[in-house]
Amino acid sequence: MSKVKSITRESWILSTFPEWGSWLNEEIEQEQVAPGTFAMWWLGCTGIWLKSEGGTNVCVDFWCGTGKQSHGNPLMKAGHQMQRMAGVKKLQPNLRTTPFVLDPFAIRQIDAVLATHDHNDHIDVNVAAAVMQNCADDVPFIGPKTCVDLWIGWGVPKERCIVVKPGDVVKVKDIEIHALDAFDRTALITLPAEQKAAGVLPDGMDERAVNYLFKTPGGTLYHSGDSHYSNYYAKHGNEHQIDVALGSYGENPRGITDKMTSADILRMAEALNTKVVIPFHHDIWSNFQADPQEIRVLWEMKKDRLKYGFKPFIWQVGGKFTWPLDKDNFEYHYPRGFDDCFTIEPDLPFKSFL
């Protein structure tokens, strides 16, 4: 059979997806985290892989799904949180713009799976399935009640799940995980389609969403999930020593307030007393596309006058950040390669060819 006749849509997908294959899985496994540091990789959206100096591996909000894929239904799902927020009817054009950089089914070494809340782009059934099928049978699934309800509904045993609420602390090897208050107001209007929000006091945030502070021997990481700006970031900054903070950033469409702005990101960093602030989430949705350089420009305008004690860092999906080695860097660039140039003799027609 000729090659063009044997190739199918399915074979094409299997040969190209996930786009990075197991490249990043292998990189993470091979990484030896030096004492006094921690390493983390951006998996897209608010997905983070954190690795400590003791070799402890945890992932947070690792999501392997997609956004809109068809114009088939021109209307938004009835009762969707964005419909409640802005009174819209049209389909939200939120296409996923980020490649899949980590293969969940190539994960072998992991010590905990965490989620900040139960929105579809922060918790994933494929990740749960891969960990259940391929990893140690004592890996815990940690999150607020709504997340645990989802995991159990997918088939994760109840005894493998740990429900956390603000104030709880979970120890995973050499990483101490503190569950903190979340400020994700969108989560409060994520309700069953038939349930009305108008005129009804929302139920508590604690069962729906949490922020996390990861205390490793080499430093601390604050993960804010989908939280909006809140004055309570200052309380967290008073109560905890924070080295690196991650904040959900995006260009909110007209009539929508769902992501922090550049000014919010700077306010969050100042309130938390962090050393480094890193925006995330702006990468994933086509209709929330934002330029993180705006954060740096605004920081440059304000840093001397307001005596900022932090720096912004502009990351790339799939890239690594190591604390404190990268604390004075402003931007990430993927490894450029060719560091071994001229270790063998070039094969050119003549020296001045290039």
Swiss-Prot record:
Task of the protein: Probably catalyzes the hydrolysis of L-ascorbate-6-P into 3-keto-L-gulonate-6-P. Is essential for L-ascorbate utilization under anaerobic conditions.
Known cofactor(s): a divalent metal cation
Lineage, uppermost ranks: Bacteria, Pseudomonadati, Pseudomonadota, Gammaproteobacteria, Enterobacterales
The protein's name: Probable L-ascorbate-6-phosphate lactonase UlaG
Main location (coarse class): cytoplasm
Induction text: Induced by L-ascorbate. Repressed by UlaR.
Family the UniProt entry places it in: Belongs to the UlaG family.
Gene: ulaG
InterPro entries: L-ascorbate_6P_UlaG, Metallo-B-lactamas, RibonucZ/Hydroxyglut_hydro, UlaG-like_MBL-fold, UPF0173_UPF0282_UlaG_hydrolase
GO MF terms held by the record: L-ascorbate 6-phosphate lactonase activity; manganese ion binding
Keyword Hydrolase part of the UniProt annotation: yes
A Pfam family the protein falls into: Lactamase_B_2
Source organism: Escherichia fergusonii (strain ATCC 35469 / DSM 13698 / CCUG 18766 / IAM 14443 / JCM 21226 / LMG 7866 / NBRC 102419 / NCTC 12128 / CDC 0568-73)
GO cellular component terms, semicolon-separated: cytoplasm
Catalytic activity, EC: 3.1.1.-
Compartmental location: Cytoplasm
Pathway membership: Cofactor degradation; L-ascorbate degradation; D-xylulose 5-phosphate from L-ascorbate: step 1/4
